[in-house]
């Protein structure tokens, strides 16, 4: 680390900027940077590329902010305020938010299915009722039956035989409405991304502290920004890849709709397991 300080003092630190970007990319590939969790979240909500980019940038923003907060706090508040001492608490806080998100995803999917099943049962009940009521009037029965059936299905753009597919299209439209055009839901995506980037990087904090101590504040900010840019490239690529893979699979595989209907359950369980894992590590670190 002494050689690095010497290079900075000689003004050669700017040569490390490309290396900082590359290290950020590689750093994003390391375990513990929420790539699996983010991909699962994008798949669960059938997220668009725009939402995947938003998720990755939010995670990078929080990751960078944590580096600055810990570095500056460590300098001006206390020597004990290090990345090693803060990381367990951040892991525990992240675990709580992640578990809450997983439970919300699971509940939202279950509620959507229950609402569809209730609506489908109500449709069948109305169909049987009309049939029994108009049994003695063949002309009226045919007219009422066709009219009621058409009125129920036409907004979905499908026939009774394809009603399940119509529901899936309606469910996809509901997801699009919830996660594309609403401020509240975009806030949920941003919150999830910000939570995913709360774990600090000791290497980035160390570089920033060295630059600040050597009065190379601008260089330190640039190095951290370059590092964060590389991290953003990795996280955004993972999210966009998940979003595109969902879209392509839906076009090429007819059975994908059935799998996609169950995917949010598996995704919420996977995200929940990640939250439990982070919570255990955070709790263990606090107790040490």
Swiss-Prot record:
Region (Disordered): 122-166
Induction pattern: By nickel and cobalt. Transcriptionally repressed by RcnR.
Ranges facing Cytoplasmic side: 34-51, 107-188, 245-265
Spans within the Periplasmic topological domain: 1-12, 73-85, 210-223, 287-288
One of the GO biological process terms: cobalt ion transport
Keyword Ion transport in annotation: yes
Molecular-function annotations in GO: nickel cation transmembrane transporter activity
Top-level taxon: Bacteria
Compartments (UniProt record): Cell inner membrane
Transmembrane segments: 13-33, 52-72, 86-106, 189-209, 224-244, 266-286
Keywords, sorted A to Z: Cell inner membrane, Cell membrane, Cobalt, Cobalt transport, Ion transport, Membrane, Nickel, Nickel transport, Transmembrane, Transmembrane helix, Transport
One GO cellular component, as annotated: plasma membrane
Biased composition range(s): Basic and acidic residues: 122-155
Record membrane topology: Multi-pass membrane protein
Role according to the record: Efflux system for nickel and cobalt.
PANTHER family: NICKEL/COBALT EFFLUX SYSTEM RCNA, NICKEL_COBALT EFFLUX SYSTEM RCNA
Family (UniProt): Belongs to the NiCoT transporter (TC 2.A.52) family. RcnA subfamily.
Name used for this protein in its record: Nickel/cobalt efflux system RcnA
